[in-house]
Amino acid sequence: MHTPKHAIRRMSKGEMEFFEGRCQRMGEAKRTMWGTKWCGSGNEAINYTDLGYFSNLDSCCRTHDHCDSIPAGETKYGLTNEGKYTMMNCKCESAFEKCLRDVRGILEGKAAAAVRKTYFDLYGNGCFNVKCPSGARSARSEECTNGMATYTGETGYGAWAINKLNG
């Protein structure tokens, strides 16, 4: 197959860098839901206070992104995450679901419902609960210094299938 000469044009280094950057940003944008900077895989935010058009929904996702978790392949609280996705603390999952349900507005409410349905019903990776033995809390922060976690199991068909097929 031949490319017609009229379709080929030399670009300056600056033009090329502009288009490369644009393509890279588009790739990132496809990982988050439209109108948000935090809802999806990764985030597009410049800093912690940077929220998208759907700021209430985005705030839910941002809080969830900064919650207690165990990344795929890592161990924390004596529990190894053998799945393909990050495993979240069940308290974080409950707070995230409540936050999504509390989002109001015609468009933003529908967007929050879509995130909730996708994340909990389809993705549904399950979560972990941490039990802290008595006397194992830090006096300063009330944080559990020697907790043990248990996994709840997948709740969504998508996570179950991916973890089983790739496991």
Curated annotation (Swiss-Prot):
Positions bound to Ca(2+): 38, 40, 42, 65
Keyword annotations from UniProtKB, A to Z: Calcium, Calcium channel impairing toxin, Disulfide bond, Glycoprotein, Hydrolase, Ion channel impairing toxin, Lipid degradation, Lipid metabolism, Metal-binding, Neurotoxin, Ryanodine-sensitive calcium-release channel impairing toxin, Secreted, Signal, Toxin, Zymogen
Alphabetized InterPro entries for the sequence: PLipase_A2_dom, PLipase_A2_dom_sf, PLipase_A2_His_AS
Propeptide intervals in chain numbering: 136-140
Location in the cell: Secreted
Tissue specificity annotation: Expressed by the venom gland.
Pfam families (UniProt xref): Phospholip_A2_2
Record field: pH dependence: Optimum pH is 8.0.
Disulfide bridges in this chain: 39-61, 60-99, 67-92, 90-127, 132-144
Bound cofactor: record note: Binds 1 Ca(2+) ion.
EC number: 3.1.1.4
GO-annotated cellular components: extracellular region
Reactions catalysed: a 1,2-diacyl-sn-glycero-3-phosphocholine + H2O = a 1-acyl-sn-glycero-3-phosphocholine + a fatty acid + H(+)
Family from the record: Belongs to the phospholipase A2 family. Group III subfamily.
Assembly information from the UniProt record: Heterodimer composed of a large subunit and a small subunit; disulfide-linked.
Name of this chain's protein: Phospholipase A2
Organism: Hottentotta tamulus (Eastern Indian scorpion)
